[in-house]
Amino acid sequence: MPRYKVFAAIDLGSTEITMKIAEVSKKNGISVLDTVKYDLSIGKESYAVGKISYNLVDKICNCFEEYLRIMKSYGVDEYVCYATTAVREASNSEYIIDQINIRTGIKVTIISNEEERFLHNKAFALNNSYFDDIIEAGAVLVDVASGSVQVSHYEQSKLQFSQNLPMGSLRVLENLSTVKNSTTSFSSVLEDFIKAGINNYKNVFYKNPNYKYFVIMGNQVRYITVSYTHLRAH
């Protein structure tokens, strides 16, 4: 009997398709062997027109066919493939996953926002030993994605509430795409739009301003970090 298994996890996201391949064993836990990313702005089309075109589905299938070859080279035993906001909100989502399955054999599971954020928080907890300490002291976890932002409030180790804001980076840009071409101060419009969304959230949900910890995470954080570093440098 082998002492380990090789798993693959595919994330069909709003801006990229990511695959991680990992070796899992009782002795060593999870060891990531490879991470592969393919940039594909599915959300840009989904958020703008409410559906995903056949041309884009074709690109997804081509990517998955390459991922299958990579999985075979690693001897992957099992895989999961999750689709998130961009596919979930597309009016032709069932057609998309059917086409992927017919062409590649890959079974795609569309997960809910709640399932997606639960997995993100669980991954954060597993990778950060201080998680239990900060949620005991009081913490706000902000999960920034392309389609939305999830804000979760913890006190005394319990989740008090969690709210989803449709203010993901890509969705906001798509919502304001017509304004962008008709103004010379788009950055100000963008700032006002985001502030309005945050203020609405604070007025309705934000009851305790004394949380000790504020944690920001998600696949869009790296862009925020780069932007902040650029501003500091200038």
Regions found by a protein language model. Name each.
Residues 76-85, 210-220:
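Short glycine-rich phosphate-binding loop at a beta-alpha junction
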Residues 34-126:
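N-terminal phosphate-binding loop and flanking beta/alpha elements of the actin-like ATPase fold
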